[in-house]
């Protein structure tokens, strides 16, 4: 008799052909909802169609189907991203002066867009140097392309075609994994496996392959470029990859191959994996050998991290165990139950991811200027300002999104009957203490931060400069910030003995780096002016958090409306006969939070723009004398509200206001148009629904008189729809106005 060990059961993780592919169904507007699919009775139908198209929760309550829809939509998103990237590379290949810029990046400005001569628009094609006329771009693509070793427009064409292939592949994957082989719910909930694959695969192998590309392709090509070799004379990427002797001429350790690696004599590789710190004086960017070293180190960390979690083999961490063991002395059951929340509520999961990614994006904004990663990025002031502003806005939106989805989780997915005495339950039970304390902090910060400015304006108006808070009168030095700067400046040789220079020139202690007689970076001094505006930052951030957190903690119930959870995520008021209950839904808190996020980020980007023009950016003479763009006026001018209005907003708006008739005139038109878009928003925000309904009814009467009445009954926007349209135009108008103001200014003077 043969005894066989039982065969291990193979888990089937996908359903085959679960949903048929039907273009007839998709062609029907609102096919995802019985009500909407019936077609329009009133004009509200089109708004509901847009509001619910991506609200998968409203299509079905089946978590598996919702998960599959989200998964499939992600592939669609990736497809759009590849298409967009492909377009960027195509513009670089077809409409740009990339090759000219590559040969002289200090005198030629990047341009990848040429305007057609229709109705005189060719005025927008400014002279960017090198005999090329086009629109100056500030996206940083040229700098990324140079850093990655792209030396010709042909290579950009090839990459653009590759992007299109990947876009098609992603579209196919989105269809395939919903209609042909759709993963089961268990697959989406297998977090350990997901962590292992994402950490080791995406982040680990991704970083490793990028490090490999940098070592074998970017470093040698950039070494030639920095030495002034004509891009057409530089060997092509595959020659470096296939011919080791070619690399060994630049980096001698390549001649020894992998021997130093396996004999643990890693120091041999120090010619291309460095730990220098600071900036390359030729390009004003981080040392590319430092960056390659960084990606190799990150890859090792993530490859290890991707083998830490317990899957089919009984070793490693289980997330559920980690969470349930996470108990503090004052937190009751601690994180018990969070595992179930995060594997059954994608809103809860998304909320955490948005909060993390939003914070990370803001961190990226701050590192792009203080540690500029790409060659010739630091001296391209327009790109520096654009990258900072862009990443700040994106980070702000993501963080508000985190609060929005946390509130949706509270309303739709939170089950109070199964949660007792865990962390979330405890936070909810003393939410009054949290919100009232936060409210007190906001009042304190608001009065004190603004009060310092009002004091200065008053003293300035009364002609008493000696009584102002300033670096030359009553000093309020940011001593903690200065201490942090100093600690980092002194780190090489003390806490970071391996590093030659500090992580960033901004800490101080070093000399400035100039490229082509322009300042790339220098130690940034902090004084009373920065102390004042930093407290405005603290104030606006805390108010944003107050509004958003109150929305989350009171999403299900409040003293005013105990049954709020039954009313849903967004509702205008608690029904007729209950006055004073409007604008209390979780959605309304997100709506209000967006305005304060806009306030907060605006002050940050204004601070950055002025500070850099005043104290960092500028030209340097052959004698070594630095002339800053605004001549260091930040310290004395930004300490009054009047100074911000007069010396920043008004003084620096002259370029955009006077741009008519020049190649910057598009920014002048955008400045005007975006102000109009912003003003248009006020019509939605300050006006009641009834006003519009009355107006519509008299317009309908006129149509009836002329027998041209539509079949679909016109309706005013609901209160929530009106506020949504209002906040959208407010933010769009405000951001586009700022964009035009910043770019016209910095392209003209930078």
From Swiss-Prot:
Subcellular compartments: Plastid, Chloroplast thylakoid membrane
Q: Which positions are annotated as binding phylloquinone?
A: 692
Keyword list (alphabetical) reads: 4Fe-4S, Chlorophyll, Chloroplast, Chromophore, Electron transport, Iron, Iron-sulfur, Magnesium, Membrane, Metal-binding, Oxidoreductase, Photosynthesis, Photosystem I, Plastid, Thylakoid, Transmembrane, Transmembrane helix, Transport
**Sites where the protein binds chlorophyll a':** 675
A GO term (biological process) for this protein? photosynthesis
Q: Any one cellular component term from GO for this entry?
A: photosystem I
Please name the GO terms that the record assigns under molecular function. Answer: 4 iron, 4 sulfur cluster binding; chlorophyll binding; electron transfer activity; magnesium ion binding; oxidoreductase activity
**Where does the chain bind [4Fe-4S] cluster?**
573, 582
Explain how, and how many, cofactor molecules are bound.
Answer: P700 is a chlorophyll a/chlorophyll a' dimer, A0 is one or more chlorophyll a, A1 is one or both phylloquinones and FX is a shared 4Fe-4S iron-sulfur center.
Q: Which Pfam families match?
A: PsaA_PsaB (PF00223)
| Cross-referenced InterPro entries | PSI_PsaA, PSI_PsaA/B, PSI_PsaA/B_CS, PSI_PsaA/B_sf
Topology versus the membrane: Multi-pass membrane protein
The record's PANTHER family line, in alphabetical order, gives:
OUTER MEMBRANE PROTEIN, OMPA-RELATED (PTHR30128), PHOTOSYSTEM I P700 CHLOROPHYLL A APOPROTEIN A1-RELATED (PTHR30128:SF19)
Subunit-level organization: The PsaA/B heterodimer binds the P700 chlorophyll special pair and subsequent electron acceptors. PSI consists of a core antenna complex that captures photons, and an electron transfer chain that converts photonic excitation into a charge separation. The eukaryotic PSI reaction center is composed of at least 11 subunits.
Report the protein's function.
PsaA and PsaB bind P700, the primary electron donor of photosystem I (PSI), as well as the electron acceptors A0, A1 and FX. PSI is a plastocyanin-ferredoxin oxidoreductase, converting photonic excitation into a charge separation, which transfers an electron from the donor P700 chlorophyll pair to the spectroscopically characterized acceptors A0, A1, FX, FA and FB in turn. Oxidized P700 is reduced on the lumenal side of the thylakoid membrane by plastocyanin.
Name by which UniProt lists this protein: Photosystem I P700 chlorophyll a apoprotein A1
* Source organism per UniProt: Lotus japonicus
Q: What is the lineage of its organism?
A: Eukaryota, Viridiplantae, Streptophyta, Embryophyta, Tracheophyta
Q: What gene name does this entry carry? A: psaA
